[in-house]
Amino acid sequence: MSNMDIDGINTGTIDKTPEEIISGTSGATRPIIRPATLAPPSNKRTRNPSPERATTSSEADVGRKTQKKQTPTEIKKSVYNMVVKLGEFYNQMMVKAGLNDDMERNLIQNAHAVERILLAATDDKKTEFQKKKNARDVKEGKEEIDHNKTGGTFYKMVRDDKTIYFSPIRITFLKEEVKTMYKTTMGSDGFSGLNHIMIGHSQMNDVCFQRSKALKRVGLDPSLISTFAGSTLPRRSGATGVAIKGGGTLVAEAIRFIGRAMADRGLLRDIKAKTAYEKILLNLKNKCSAPQQKALVDQVIGSRNPGIADIEDLTLLARSMVVVRPSVASKVVLPISIYAKIPQLGFNVEEYSMVGYEAMALYNMATPVSILRMGDDAKDKSQLFFMSCFGAAYEDLRVLSALTGTEFKPRSALKCKGFHVPAKEQVEGMGAALMSIKLQFWAPMTRSGGNEVGGDGGSGQISCSPVFAVERPIALSKQAVRRMLSMNIEGRDADVKGNLLKMMNDSMAKKTNGNAFIGKKMFQISDKNKTNPVEIPIKQTIPNFFFGRDTAEDYDDLDY
């Protein structure tokens, strides 16, 4: 399934009445189809970028033909063209797979299968690696895997009297055929479309899985989860991927690099490795919003032989990002199966913003269906889907509840698993359900972290990373942050560390009832032109943090 940045720009029209757009409000009960038996980017511009290093940096880069700066209208038209073409590609792949029923095409798992096949087919670097590995395996007498093919598990609809259920089927495609079909449909190499899909998968992983193991491996507290957005993004997502990565994700990349450099002192003498390391640190510096944070990164950049001291500095930096949030872009990314429905939905705007009204209206019009795994609750699954589409894993649950009119639950209270169905769970006669949670109100997405004002917090996740630009208090567990502030600041950069700790303490001493995004309001989903601003109601009985107590599957344990 799948998941740019022009805040506040909402031009264009949608040929849908307000009533049609609102038709699936959150509170409505949707039918469940029951089964018979439920069983490091590059900053350099290259003339011919490869699929491994797509260098689009934001919504402004989508469909760019020349270096001339595009107007907001041109950007939105090129984005609209991209999502429509992605939908066309999906339809072609489904025809090739022999899955033509509407229910099959609405299935989120089928959209994911097509997306994964496309990413595998266009990953020339991985294909080359598989080719070399095959050559070695043949020499060693092992079974050869055809590196020219890729495949996925699709779900075919089966009708049994009055019951509808789904059965898994494995379908393979030639990589070259998939690549040719994609490039022909997109009219170009379509790097922006690939990046869009990668971001969607990353946002889904952020919602469905915890990353405690990955955090612990680099010495970071699992409570820093809200800074770990985009941690499963592949490097080939380029600058677009860096924009949506959290500060903690980049800190972890830098710490891993330092760990390798400590084990192999010759590593940073290699010009490619040194350049990659410097890029990670420069990206991290650009993420930082406070001068004290940037100064700490400069200390690490200036270190000739990075080691333990630099890891300590970066750990402190990650902790400070809980209080003074870095710049993280937010985008609405929908499964390409929804983009395939744009012509049928009467969505004739010919302009589309992934951070504004159009994406949210399209989300409300769509009727996506998901396979239900054993024990899944349909409404809980709908919450996972909503949060995946909007990249809202670390958003305040009270804000999401206000926008949808549905009380959102923390991950530990949800009775459902992720959208990927492991091989051992793929059986005949699987049930499915419509994803029923819809927006009653909308607000533009944000790429800023709000401000450093604190509030009450929990015991697992200890801060929020805002996605919607609406005025509200920012949830932060001050007690947990204060525990992290008690650390030794002696050493080569005591002044820099001291300044950063002082900034954090000053921030923590502020009143807890201050708000972020002052003056920003939400709007009814029918109010495209933002004529009637509505104050967001914050319901105190709903917890702030989705990962307050981490009970989700760990991404590292995922069995593909």
Swiss-Prot record:
UniProt GO MF annotations: RNA binding; structural molecule activity
Main location: virion
Domain of life of the native organism: Viruses
Gene Ontology cellular-component annotations: helical viral capsid; host cell; host cell nucleus; ribonucleoprotein complex; viral nucleocapsid
InterPro entries reported for this sequence: Flu_NP
Example of a GO biological process term: viral penetration into host nucleus
SUPFAM superfamilies noted in UniProt: flu NP-like (SSF161003)
Subunit composition and interactions: Homomultimerizes to form the nucleocapsid. May bind host exportin-1/XPO1. Binds to viral genomic RNA. Protein-RNA contacts are mediated by a combination of electrostatic interactions between positively charged residues and the phosphate backbone and planar interactions between aromatic side chains and bases.
Protein name in the entry: Nucleoprotein
